[in-house]
Each structure stands twice: as C-alpha cells, then as structure tokens.
Amino acid sequence: MTPEGLMKMQAVSVGLLLFSMTWAAPMPNEDRSSCGNQDSIHKDLAASVYPDPTVDEGTEDGQGALLHPPGQDRYGAALLRNITQPVKSLVTGAELRREGNQEKRPQSVLSVIPADVNDAKVSLKDIKNQESYLLTQSSPVKSKHTKHTRQTRRSTHYLTHLPQIKKTPSDLEGSGSPDLLVRGDNDVPPFSGDGQHFMHIPGKGGAGSGPESSTSRPLSGSSKAEVIDPHMSGLGSNEIPGREGHGGSAYATRDKAAQGAGSAGGSLVGGSNEITGSTNFRELPGKEGNRINAGSQNAHQGKVEFHYPQVASREKVKGGVEHAGRAGYNEIPKSSKGSSSKDAEESKGNQLTLTASQRFPGKGKSQGPALPSHSLSNEVKSEENHYVFHGQNNLTPNKGMSQRRGSWPSRRPNSHRRASTRQRDSSESSSSGSSSESHGD
C-alpha cells in the first residue's frame, strides 16, 4: 500500500475512535473537566497542539501503526477534552446563569411578598385611617355638643347667680342688710347729730330732757316724754357706756321734774322719725317752728345747729340749775369740798337764773331751763345769746307740732363734730359736778 492510503486509513480510524470515545467517555472525567481546572486544560491543549511524531513508526510498519497507534487514547482524550470543553463551559455558564437567576428569583419573590404584605398593611392602614377619620368626623360633633352643654351649664349657673348680685340691697348706712327693704323706701332709722342711732329708754311717766341730752323733739298733745341716753350718742358703735348708774339717777330726778312742771318736754319715739322726702330748709323758719334761724341758713352756708327745749323742776331751782351750770366747765375739781363748790355755784347762779327767766318769762324761776353746755370756754360768751334766742323760738311753737311734719335738717361734718364734743364734755362734766356737789354737801 502506498503511504497515502495508509494516511487515509489512519485518519478514518482516528475518526472512528474519536466518535466511539465521545460516546463512551467516562463521566468523572467530564466532571473533573467541568470543575474548571485551567492548568490541565492548558496542558491538554499543549499536548494536542504538539503531538508526538508517528510517521517514522507508521512507515516502518503500517499495520502495526494502524493497529497500535502510539498514544492514541491519550491524544483522543485530549482532543475530546479540547473539543468538548468549550461546549461544556458554555453549558455550565448557562446553567450557572440559570442557577443564579433561580437563586435571585426567591429573593425577588421574597421582595414581592413583603410588598404584597405591605400593600395589605397599607390597605389596613387606609381602613384604620378611614375609621379614624369617620370617628373624628363624629367626635367633633360630640365635642361640640359637650362644649355646648358646658357653656349652657355655665351660662345657666351664671344666670342663677345674677339675680342674687342684682338683689343686693343698700340702705342709707351702707350695711347692705336685706331686712331694711321690708320697710318703705323713705323709712330710715333716725340719727343723732354725730351719726349714731337713737336709743330710747322707756320711763315710768316720762322725763324732760336735761342739758346733756343729745336730741329731743316735742310730740303733739303730750306732756310726757322719753329720754334719749346721752352717753350712747357720743360713743362709738362698739363702745359700752360706763355711766349707767349716774344716768339712772339723773333720769329719776328728771322724771319727777317733768311731772311737776307740766310743760312741753322733748320726746322721741323709737322708729317713728321717718324721713318722708326732701325738705326745703329755707321754708322752715316761718312754717315748721323756727327750728333754724332765718339768717343761719345763709350765714353758716347750710350748717345746721340743734336747739332743744329743756325742762327743770320748781323745787330744785338752785340745785338743778346750778348743777347744770357746773356741767359746762371741766375746770371744777372732782374732789372739791364746800368752798370750791360753793364758789362755783355763786359764780354761776346769777348767769343761769337770768337765762332761765328769759326763757320762761310767764312761769317764773321754777321753770327756767339750763343752758346747753359746751366744752370750749372761749365760745360760751359769744354764743350764749345766740342759743338763748333760739331757745325762746323753740319752746312755744313746737308745742303743738306733729312729729310727722317735722323733718330732719341736713347733716354737716362740722356740726357733727361740734355736737359730739359738746355731748361728751357735757356728760363728763355732769358726772363730775354731781360728785363734787355730794362732797360739798
């Protein structure tokens, strides 16, 4: 055979071997090759690229060369590996990509599932928000209703208290006592000169007002009278009078004096002095009994002075009148004996008998009343005639006047101050004079 025929035969045999080996190739080799050992691949490629020369051996013995090719298995395996390696590498790459995709798919699925769960949660949140929105829509109505009820309650509570605030009374004294509203609007309790209430003391037969009495007004058609406590008018609202014993003895003597005299005495019935309205004091001198002098309104610019009638007994002209005269001076010592008291009586006797005769010219010396006293010795001389003049006007016209028609004059702070000082000094001097007279006797 020619060498060309041999070469063809070898090529065919190699092809068959390669075909048979590709089908009968072991799997572990494929697994090893699939593991991707690059060093072995490079070695196989080098072996396949540079095979051992076999021409000489084949030329010598063609049949032996055909039957026993040198390193045929090795070369065939190397060729098969070189041929199949790229294919398997491609397959493994696709598989790896598929595996990577499969590994990624669960992640995406997991990511999708929480998204669904999140959607469900969002839907639940939306439902809750809807419910809360509905609740908020319903709750403002409730809150408005509660606010309205609270406002109505507060408003009604306030309205219940409003009439109490409006019904608070205010009387003339400013005490706010609701009991005073039972009486009429013009029914005001009487006042003394210094702003204190009148305190009437009921007597057996009545008593004439002495020089230290605060105020007295004649009652129509009655010769008896009630005496006002002289110490209560000068004291404060919380002070307690300390001369109850002296006052009782003085009232007893005045009761007898008033019964013996039979003349019109000052009187005051508690609660009967009612202010019936505003009074024009300019019309009083000619109509209401000359309570105020005709020139005193303009001379004193509205200041009112009180002038009161006084009654003394016939039996005790000297003692009673001189006792009242001593009440005008605080200079008489309390522990004086016969000489000092007699000097004071002699010095005052003439003056007081003259004033008594001027005030009762028709009835003699027995009815001569005492002059109302003051504490200021400098003002006695200047005001003696003034008071006597008013005393004459006061006695006769006031005898038949009704107490309802008479009205109280306007109150002034100066007159209050002077009246209060006179009342206090007169009460103190009367008590001191009575003690000195007892020591002198």
Swiss-Prot record:
For this protein, what post-translational modification is recorded in UniProt? Answer: Phosphorylated on serine residues in the ASARM motif; the phosphorylation is important for the inhibition of bone mineralization.
Q: Where is this region: Disordered?
A: 137-441
Q: What is known of its domains?
A: The acidic serine aspartate-rich MEPE-associated (ASARM) motif is sufficient when phosphorylated to inhibit bone mineralization by osteoblasts and cartilage mineralization by chondrocytes by binding hydroxyapatite crystals during the mineralization stage. It can also inhibit dentin mineralization. The dentonin region is sufficient to promote dental pulp stem cell proliferation. It can also stimulate bone formation, osteoblast differentiation, and activate integrin signaling pathways.
Give the motif span (Cell attachment site).
183-185
Q: Where in the cell is it found?
A: Secreted, Extracellular space, Extracellular matrix; Secreted
For this UniProt entry, what's an example GO CC term? extracellular region
From the UniProt entry, list the residue stretches annotated as the region Dentonin: 178-200
Question: Which Pfam family, any one of them, does this sequence belong to?
Answer: Osteoregulin
The positions flagged as glycosylation sites are: N82, S192
Q: How does it assemble?
A: Interacts (via ASARM motif) with PHEX; the interaction is zinc-dependent.
GO terms of biological process kind: bone mineralization; negative regulation of bone mineralization; skeletal system development
Q: Segment ASARM motif: which positions?
A: 424-441
Induction info reads: Induced by ascorbate and beta-glycerophosphate. Induced expression during bone fracture healing, with low levels of expression being detected in fibroblast-like cells at 6 days post-fracture, and increased expression at 10 days post-fracture in late hypertrophic chondrocytes. At 14 days post-fracture, expression is detected in osteocytes, osteoblasts, and hypertrophic chondrocytes. By 28 days post-fracture, expression was highest in osteocytes and lower in osteoblasts. Down-regulated by 1-alpha-25-dihydroxyvitamin D3 (calcitriol).
Q: State where composition is biased (Basic residues).
A: 142-156
Instruction: Identify this protein by name.
Output: Matrix extracellular phosphoglycoprotein
- Distribution of this protein across tissues and organs: Expressed in osteocytes (at protein level). Expressed by chondrocytes, specifically in the hypertrophic zone of the bone growth plate (at protein level). Expressed in osteoblasts in bone (at protein level). Expressed by osteoblasts within the metaphysis (at protein level). Expressed at low levels in white fat, brown fat, testes, brain and aorta. Expressed in the craniofacial complex (at protein level). Expressed in odontoblasts, ameloblasts and in predentin during tooth development (at protein level). Expressed in the kidney (at protein level).
Anything else of interest in the record? It has been proposed that MEPE is cleaved and generate 2 peptides dentonin and ASARM peptide.
